[in-house]
Amino acid sequence: MDTTQISRRQILVVGSCNTDMVIKAAHLPRPGETILGGTFFMNPGGKGANQAVAIARLGGSVTFICKTGSDIFGHQSQQLFEEEGINTSYVFSDSGNPSGVALITVDEKAENCIVVASGANANLLPSDLAKAEEAIELADLILMQLE
């Protein structure tokens, strides 16, 4: 599918939204080992969010359904999606749970270990999807992940 085909379709992504906290290290720690890392950075992430952003950057018309916490990570994600031109009408905020985060350690060979705290992602409920019924019905393509 080329970008012309993508721009003509209504694409709906249902999925996760995380903040990736990445630290680079010489090697991955073994159980019980504490090591000193190098560079640390944070990126928006989550398989669903990554798909939605990629589609938007290819010129697609994309709506994203997800749930974030009503914390700084959730607010930053919402802002990023809006800047990317993603329809955020169904980015739900959960005041009772934090946004999802992924703690990622990457070694010199680009091997990684990832621990995900799903947070509000785990509380995306059928009742939330019911609120997005119109967007679901209008979608030409629906993407979902197993994260």
Where are these regions (language model features)?
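Glycine-rich phosphate/adenosyl-contacting loop at the front of the ribokinase-like
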Residues: M1-K67, I72-Q76, E82-I86, A139
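Ribokinase/PfkB-type carbohydrate-kinase core domain
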Residues: D2-C17, H75, Q79-S93, N97, ...
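Residue-level marker for the onset of beta-strands and adjacent loop->beta junctions
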Residues: Q51, S99-A102
